[in-house]
Amino acid sequence: MRKVFYLIIVGLSLPLFIQAQMLNMSSNLPRKGDRLIKHQVTPCEPGKKGHQQIWDFSKVNLQEANYELTYTEQGTDTIIGTEHRTMYYYHASGDSLFCIGYENPTTFITYQKPELLFAFPVFQGSSVTDYFDASGNYCDQLNIRLRGKSRVTADASGMLILPEGDTLRKVLRICTHRQIHQKMTRKEEIPDSLGHTPFILDRDSIEYLLAGDSIHLETETWRWYADGYRYPVFETVKSTAYKFGKAYEHFTTSFVYLPDEQYYDLPYDTD
C-alpha cells in the first residue's frame, strides 16, 4: 500500500518538474559564432520573487540605442563575448562558468580568482555565493585592484510578455548581486615584486573591505531566460554606489533580446 501511495505522489509531482524551467551547460553556455542584438528599452523594475509571476513588459518602449553582442572562440577553452567595445573572457570548468577577464580601449582586467557566473544546473530557488579578486590597469597609468563577492540566485519564474506583445511561458529569472571594492593607485607605487607573490584568496579580507570601506559599488542584474532559448530574452541592470553607508543610485537600464532575432531555438540546435 505504501508503495502504491508513493507512486501516486511521484506521478502527481512529475508535471510540476516537467513544467519547471532549468538552465544547463549544454543549452545555456555562450557559444562561438552566435550573434545577438540588445535593444535598449525603458528601464523596468524587476518585480517580485517567487513562482507564477507575470512580467508584463508590453508597454515599454524600444529606444534608439542597440548593441551587438558576438561570441568568438579563443583556443579550446575560452569564449570571448564582445559588446560595446569591451571583450569579456569566459571559461567553463566542471559544472561552472567563470569570467576570467575583460578589456577595452582604456581598461585591462585579469582575474587571479575568476568570478563565478553560473553553477549548473540552475533551477528555481538555487543560489550560489562566491568571491573574486582581479587586477589590471587603466590607460596604462593607474593600477586597478578589484575584490568582491557575488551571489547568483534563481529567484522567480513565470510568464513574460514582450514589448511586441508576444507571450513567453516557462520563464526563469536569474538575479546576480555583486559587491565590488575597487582600489586605484599610480603604477609606480606598486613594487614589481608584488606581481610575483603567490596568490591566496582571502575571503575574510574581502568581507572586511565590503563592510568597512567608506565607498563601494553594488550591481544587481536580473536576466529572464525562456524555455527554448540559449540566451536571456530580457535584462535589467541596476548600479548603486555606497558612500559612508548611504546609497546613491548610479544607473538603471534594461534590454530586450527579441526571440525572433536570436535564431537559436534549442530543439533545432546542431550542437
Identify the meaning behind each predicted range.
Residues 1-24:
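Bacterial Sec-dependent N-terminal signal peptides
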Residues 21-271:
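Conserved functional acidic sites
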